[in-house]
């Protein structure tokens, strides 16, 4: 069924039911109770819980899955696989919905697993001990309260599209990256984020294989802080070594756990 402007109640029946918002020129926010808010005063739909198996958003708009109003349920969201699973539902347990063309996620008050896509995602865990992974693309990652893990795989958060963790809480949060380290070496400041400037500071002698380093850019209130994780070759390699912005972190960088 094709969605439109206005506030509608949508339900399915036997078989695979699809609600298609691809023709609706609005940003969507899908939240607890099957509520689908459409930006621009286009109304709010109510989608009958779990009668609908597939929700298609407009790929040219910014669309969000919002679990922040939930009190008991937790979320498993994988935007790369277009899959939303809601856990701890009364009388049901878990239920899954295919969600296409969503870029952003706000987690619940519980322990969520949130995985982004190759787009630029804005992923927020909310309360609870969350596992958050942005995949490729320049992602904004927010853990919220709880002991959160930010997970990065090979090819994620490189120089040409690095991620930003907005609220890294050292001592509570940890980073699951290419290297395991219980210490981060401070390399001072860099003049720019060009590969050439980074290679001068993170050179073959100082930035050894499997090393974790921190450095800053700018000064005063404009100072930004970054982590660099070397994969297995000395010196900074823009196409291989991970770089993560952690401006605004709390705690002592020397205590950061990278697992």
Give the location of each predicted region:
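Right-handed beta-helix
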Residues: 32-34, 80, 85-87, 147-153, ...
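Generic structural motif
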Residues: 30, 77, 186-189, 209-214, ...
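Acidic, glycine-rich calcium-binding repeat modules characteristic of RTX/beta-roll
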Residues: 1-74, 81-83, 94-96, 111-197
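Low-complexity acidic/polar repeat-biased segments
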Residues: 47-48, 53, 63-64, 93-104, ...
